[in-house]
């Protein structure tokens, strides 16, 4: 059901997807859908959670244990952009999810997934960040999301990867002064 829901949510959007379409695509009864999910929104939440976890796994797998903090952070950035290039993922996570689930729910989900890796990477690279670690994580996470949207719209991924590296290097230089 999650796969069928994902396909339809990507193709039509949440609002335009009806539960009869989902059950038909999944090859199950409506009763089966409601046995597993309270409603369409709960199914959508499961789809979004699965997508967020997939992105986080890609980021976590992107660096080797011996990589230094900067190398690991830049590899994680590249992995994030690669994971977000999965067809429909940017739309689901960055456009549909906030509209359907609300920003607090999406922020909490991100905090449990991709943002965890970003926070750890920044903490390793910028131990002098101190109390700025939280705000820096939030700001860079937003920059990553905007870059993913721009890349999906036709922007050059390589340019955004270079820009993220420049931002990270600039932060490191500034905080070490």
Regions found by a protein language model. Give the residues of each.
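Short hydrophobic clusters on alpha-helical segments that form packing/core surfaces
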Residues: 1-9
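Short, structured helix-loop boundary elements
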Residues: 19, 41, 45, 49, ...
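An amphipathic alpha-helix adjacent to DNA-recognition modules
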Residues: 2-3, 15-16, 27, 36-60, ...
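Hydrophobic alpha-helical connector segments
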Residues: 46, 57-88, 136-140
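Amphipathic alpha-helical segments used for helix-helix packing
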Residues: 84-104, 149
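Amphipathic alpha-helical packing segments from all-alpha helical-bundle domains
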Residues: 53-56, 71, 75, 101-130, ...
């Amino acid at each position: 059901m999650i796969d069928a829901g994902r396909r339809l949510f990507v193709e039509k959007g949440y609002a335009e997807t009806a539960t009869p379409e989902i059950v038909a695509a999944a090859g199950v009864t409506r009763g089966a859908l409601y046995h597993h999910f309270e409603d369409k929104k709960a199914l959508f939440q499961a789809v979004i959670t699965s997508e967020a976890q997939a992105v986080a796994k890609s980021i976590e797998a992107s660096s080797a244990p011996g990589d230094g903090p900067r190398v690991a952070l830049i590899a994680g950035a590249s992995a994030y952009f690669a994971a977000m290039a999965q067809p429909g993922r940017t739309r689901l996570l960055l456009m549909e999810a906030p509209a359907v689930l609300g920003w607090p729910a999406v922020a909490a989900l991100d905090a449990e997934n991709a943002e965890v890796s970003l926070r750890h990477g920044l903490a390793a690279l910028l131990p002098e960040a101190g109390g700025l670690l939280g705000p820096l994580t939030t700001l860079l996470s937003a920059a990553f999301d905007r870059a993913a949207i721009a890349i999906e719209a036709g922007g050059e991924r390589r340019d955004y990867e270079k820009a993220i590296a420049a931002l990270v290097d600039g932060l490191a230089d500034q905080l070490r002064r």
